[in-house]
């Protein structure tokens, strides 16, 4: 019962993170229901600026190799179990993404827009465009896996800290968790902004990325992570 109760406490502590994600997901699902794929892509990707081009171009790269370097940081403090948690979450999420990608073989926006010669696909200079396996977005999954892992570990430490927990500390914690969610969501949106993915690709990628850390944490908390106080 202690194990199940602890998981419930962690999820309850991250209720703001989870609820806001579900609200965002519901809004995006509503957009997917209301607009055709190409029309929604143009709607989501209609305002480009030089600053945004540079920001999303480089921020999107974080989900490639930098995220894995950051996940190695706990090794400095000899907390290899935290790196194992990040690694198992990213690997499991990546496996799910690759299985789905190769089941659907969905074309990327640059290929789909060839069928719409009257529409100009928004592109960012210097970004190498990909053409296949669009669904779901692997980068988005990576972003959400990483920041959800951070949120789960932050919640665990919050629950087991010696500092007094009250409404004020909970509000500060919840705001911190929303910053993590915003960083994940920005990563997902960057894939739409760069026209590497459609909104549906990003939506499903976020679902995979949000879910896998919870599953891995549930399965490995006692055996691998050894986070019992």
Which positions does each model-derived feature cover?
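Interfacial segments of alpha-helical transmembrane regions
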Residues: 16-17, 71-99, 177
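N-terminal transmembrane-helix/juxtamembrane module of multi-pass inner/ER membrane proteins
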Residues: 2-68, 101-130
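Membrane-embedded catalytic cores of phosphoryl/pyrophosphoryl-handling enzymes
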Residues: 122-229
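Hydrophobic alpha-helical transmembrane segments
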Residues: 59-79, 139-149, 154
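Aromatic-anchored segments of alpha-helical transmembrane domains
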Residues: 26-31, 91-99, 182-195
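Transmembrane alpha-helical segments of multi-pass membrane transport proteins and ion-pumping complexes
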Residues: 94-98, 102, 210-217
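Membrane-interface helix-boundary motifs at transmembrane edges
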Residues: 8-11, 74-87, 158-168
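Membrane-interfacial segments
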Residues: 39, 80, 87, 103-108, ...
């Amino acid at each position: 019962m202690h194990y199940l109760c602890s998981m419930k406490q962690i999820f309850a502590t991250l209720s703001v993170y989870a609820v806001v994600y579900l609200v965002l997901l519901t809004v995006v699902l509503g957009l997917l229901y209301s607009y055709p794929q190409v029309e929604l892509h143009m709607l989501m990707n209609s305002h480009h600026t030089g600053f945004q081009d540079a920001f999303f171009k480089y921020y999107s790269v974080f989900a490639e190799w930098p995220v894995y370097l950051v996940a190695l940081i706990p090794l400095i403090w000899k907390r290899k179990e935290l790196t194992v948690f990040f690694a198992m979450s990213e690997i499991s999420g990546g496996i799910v993404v690759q299985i789905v990608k190769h089941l659907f073989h969905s074309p990327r926006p640059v290929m789909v827009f060839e069928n719409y010669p009257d529409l100009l696909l928004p592109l960012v200079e210097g970004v190498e465009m990909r053409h296949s396996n669009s669904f779901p977005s692997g980068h988005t999954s990576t972003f959400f896996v990483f920041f959800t892992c951070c949120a789960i570990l932050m919640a665990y430490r919050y629950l087991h800290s010696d500092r007094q927990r009250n409404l004020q500390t909970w509000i500060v914690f919840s705001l911190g968790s929303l910053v993590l969610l915003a960083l994940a969501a920005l990563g997902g949106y960057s894939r739409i902004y760069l026209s590497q993915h459609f909104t549906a690709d990003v939506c499903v990628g976020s679902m995979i990325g949000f879910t896998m850390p919870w599953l891995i944490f549930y399965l490995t908390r006692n055996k691998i992570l050894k986070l019992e106080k």
